[in-house]
Regions:
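His/Asp/Glu-rich metal-coordinating catalytic cores
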Residues: 10-38, 42, 48-185, 192
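Hard-cation-handling environments
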Residues: 165-238
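Short, solvent-exposed amphipathic alpha-helical segments in soluble enzyme
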Residues: 139-142, 165, 200-205, 299-302
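Conserved beta-strand termini and adjacent loop/short-helix elements that scaffold enzyme active sites
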Residues: 35-37, 84-87, 101-103, 209-213, ...
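Structural motif
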Residues: 36-37, 48, 64-66, 125-127, ...
Length: 322
């Protein structure tokens, strides 16, 4: 006997997604959120990037001690309960098996590996970086079926510029700014990238956005971190360099500066390498989705889709799959 139309439609129904967006990444059927914008039951925070401004509560905060300390230095640490975990130390939270592991992005930053009661495994990666630094733990990998990740520079770069190439860009742009009689605004969100660059540049005292300045001061106690003087600044003289995070509103300068954006995280090829090495079949991008990124993953039979608030999804365009 052939199945009824109702039976046929049920048998071909797509499985429900493992993750969804609910003011942050939410693991469906659980009380676990990741890098969420509001307070929830248990909220994993991958790095200081995930809490861009101060807020009162974030539910029970799951993160590393280093990230919490850096959040406090930036005046962004939420109030409430905390569940601090070292890296590479699996534990159970209810029916979920969890593990934090290094993503080589910022001091204290981590990715989260989750094993669901269904045995399905999910990685919430944050914004990992494969550009190694002696200031951070090397990038680590775990195996999973689903990956949630931010790779904002993947649509623009097949491979990210090297540190030497970035330093050359800063020197060249500064020379042009000096010739034009304007400041140079360097957009850089990573205090680690900044530390590696200034070691190769002769810029004098660092003039930094207040958040970069606070992070820089906090990092002075870390081993091997460069001991260079920095000041919090909102303006600089023509020909000088002002370092500014990507997400911060531009400073109000007397003249329009030259502007240079420094990439970090994963390139398009780096994202493909990360996904393949993790064995995933589905990738959700909280930043960095594009048709080119989806096609690069699709070539390896990995589906890709954007994950974020509705206004963000409109920018991403249509989801793509192999």
């Amino acid at each position: 006997m052939s199945p009824s139309p109702r039976q046929r439609s049920t048998s071909h129904r797509k499985p429900l997604p493992t993750v969804t967006w609910r003011q942050g990444v939410h693991l469906v059927g659980s009380a676990l959120w990741c890098d969420a914008l509001r307070a929830h039951g248990l909220c994993f925070v991958s790095s200081v990037r995930a809490i861009p401004r101060a807020r009162k509560r974030a539910g029970t905060l799951l993160t590393t001690q280093t990230t919490l300390s850096l959040l406090s230095a930036l005046h962004r640490a939420p109030e409430g309960a905390q569940l601090l975990s070292p890296l590479r130390r699996p534990f159970f939270w209810g029916s979920l098996r969890l593990e934090l592991f290094a993503n080589s992005d910022l001091p204290g930053s981590a990715s989260l590996w989750v094993k669901l009661p269904s045995e399905e495994r999910v990685i919430v990666a944050g914004q990992p970086s494969e550009q190694s630094s002696e200031l951070l733990e090397p990038l680590q990998l775990r195996q999973a079926e689903t990956l949630v990740i931010a790779a904002p520079w993947a649509p623009l770069h097949q491979e990210l510029p090297t540190l030497d190439e970035m330093a050359h860009s800063v020197r060249s742009e500064r020379a042009l700014a000096q010739a034009m009689g304007v400041p140079l605004l360097v957009r850089c969100s990573s205090v680690v990238k900044l530390a590696e660059l200034v070691g190769t540049l002769d810029l004098g005292p660092l003039k930094l956005h207040v958040d970069l300045h606070r992070a820089w001061q906090w990092c002075q106690s870390l081993p091997r971190f460069p001991k260079l003087h920095s000041v919090s600044a909102r303006t600089v003289a023509p020909g000088e360099v002002l370092w500014w995070p990507h997400a911060a509103p531009p400073p109000k300068l007397p003249v329009t500066p030259r502007e240079l954006h420094l990439a970090d995280g994963l390139s398009r090829a780096g994202l493909v390498r990360y996904a393949r090495a993790s064995g995933v079949r589905q990738v959700y991008l909280t930043a960095g989705f594009s048709s080119e990124v989806a096609a690069a993953l699709s070539a390896h039979k990995i589906s890709a889709a954007p994950l974020g608030p509705p206004q963000q999804l409109a920018l991403f365009g249509e989801l793509a799959a192999p």
